Amino acid sequence: LAKLDIVKYVVSEEGVKSYIVNKLLELLNSKLLHYLKRLDSNSICIFNEYFEEEILNEKNKVCSYFNFSGAERKSIDLACLFTFSDIRRLQGGVQYNIAIYDELFDSSFDEKGIELITRILQDRVEELDECSIVISHRKESIKAVTGDVIYLEKENGITRRLDYKEI
């Protein structure tokens, strides 16, 4: 009977599952805090054991996601994106080194925000050997991106690649 009780405890909500979830939450929340700080955010996002988020403003008061400005919400979104990407890298046997960001710079961010995001992307390229593809409709945001730039133009429903001389 004692062995059965041990097995029941191990597979129960308080056993191994709880231990693993708590370790994952510790990593998840520390990564989120790391990226929010790098994005110069005044908010803190914390996930609980049910993976429900709680967002604290600069006064450490719980706030709705929708009470934040567009740039602040985008910072929270990107912190979550980078965090889950990092955690995914640690899981499983399949490794990948490509990330595609569609319209990453196209809304809400000022020059400083674009610079902070660019630094994160550059660090991911250097530290994780990640190939980052950024799709943008804003020509001014291309200045922030390093590496090769491919210009596309859509005219009459047809998209074509532009030669650098055509720009």
List each language-model region with its residue ranges.
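Terminal ABC-like ATPase head and other globular end-domains that cap long coiled-coil arms
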Residues: 2-167
